């Protein structure tokens, strides 16, 4: 169940949104289309690099044990 403060916040959110006038961004400049496209492309590239890094670091590796070089009489397949 949601805490009472969270419910109050959700109820007052539309009231707060109505108080904000559109275009009241202080110090914000308009984003040009090439800049916006570059930001989206850079975000996609960084996201792909993160996915590849997680895949490379997270995949299981088969490591040979130290006993692979030893030959035992009662172990078929090793010798």
Curated annotation (Swiss-Prot):
Species: Sus scrofa
Signal sequence annotation: 1-18
One of the GO BP terms on file: positive regulation of phosphatidylinositol 3-kinase/protein kinase B signal transduction
Keyword ATP-binding attributed: no
Protein's recorded name: Hematopoietic cell signal transducer
PANTHER family found in the cross-reference section: HEMATOPOIETIC CELL SIGNAL TRANSDUCER
GRB2 binding site, as annotated region: 72-74
Annotated GO MF terms: phosphatidylinositol 3-kinase binding; signaling receptor binding
């Amino acid at each position: 169940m949601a805490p009472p403060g969270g419910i109050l916040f959700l109820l007052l959110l539309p009231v707060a949104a109505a108080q904000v006038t559109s275009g009241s961004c202080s110090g914000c400049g308009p984003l040009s289309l090439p800049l916006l496209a570059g930001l989206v492309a850079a975000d996609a590239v960084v996201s792909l690099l993160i996915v590849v890094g997680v895949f490379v670091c997270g995949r299981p590796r088969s490591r040979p044990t130290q006993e692979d070089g030893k030959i035992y009489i009662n172990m078929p397949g090793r010798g």
